Amino acid sequence: MVPTYSYSPTCVEIQPGSTMDILFPVTQDKKKTVWISKTYPWADGWFAGGMTSNGEVTADVVYAGFGVTAPELGYDDYKDIDVKGKIVLVEGETPNISRNPDSLAMWYKHTLHQTKLNNAAAHGAAGLLYKWVPGPNAPYNPGFVYCHVTDTVVNDIFRGTGKTYKETIRQIYKTQKPASFHTGKRAHIKMNATYNPNATGKNILGMIKGSDPILCNEYVIISAHLDHLGMIPFLIEGANDNNSSSAAMLGVAEALAKSK
């Protein structure tokens, strides 16, 4: 049997008018500070967060490393730094460089988008600049705006701080200690987004019942997705990711059906 069924994922539709700017302080007459804004083009500078809230925020930018709070691992990017009402700049993944399976398992939950975004919101951040490519499994936090940023934006934020991004991240990996700091920059994030908690998607399910009287009650699931990531910001070739996998899955299904 090959039934088609619907499901209801949550989604956010990004509308025209969304923007992201970095504001740089310039001191005039040794007394007055004015803020000069630099607007970054979509794709070259930023991408909207997949589950961003609708809204607009301007706030100081705090670099918060990997955005991880892991007391069980003795690591906290938010320790001794106030991000309430601020916009945090965070990395994807974690500072863990070990390939040991046990170590990877302990750090795993801190690699997830939802963990990082929820953690930033829990610390009172008003928004987030995410130095990582868009991906699934992000949570929706009402009133919390975020976007993904490229190296161009990150390097501009670090400029004039006495630090470089490359050396800062290298030291975190080397010492396994946070290096969070106030950057002295501000960011303006405007997301024109519509949240839809009841979007409709469709899947196709095919099932071949097993012949063993005992094992027929157990299942092996083979799956693939047809959707394509597009530009993130580099091109993901849709013919390969993930249509080649979808074609392989259909080939496996045909072979199994014929061998029954």
Across the structure, where does each feature detected by a protein language model lie?
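Conserved structured core elements
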Residues: 114, 216, 220-223, 243-250
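Active-site alpha-helical elements of protease catalytic centers
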Residues: 119-123, 239-253
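Noncatalytic luminal/extracellular "stalk/propeptide" segments of secretory-pathway proteins
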Residues: 1-97, 185, 200-201
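A conserved hydrophobic secondary-structure block that centers on an alpha-helix together
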Residues: 64-138
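Alpha-helix capping and helix-loop boundary segments enriched in small/acidic/polar residues
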Residues: 104-108, 233-244
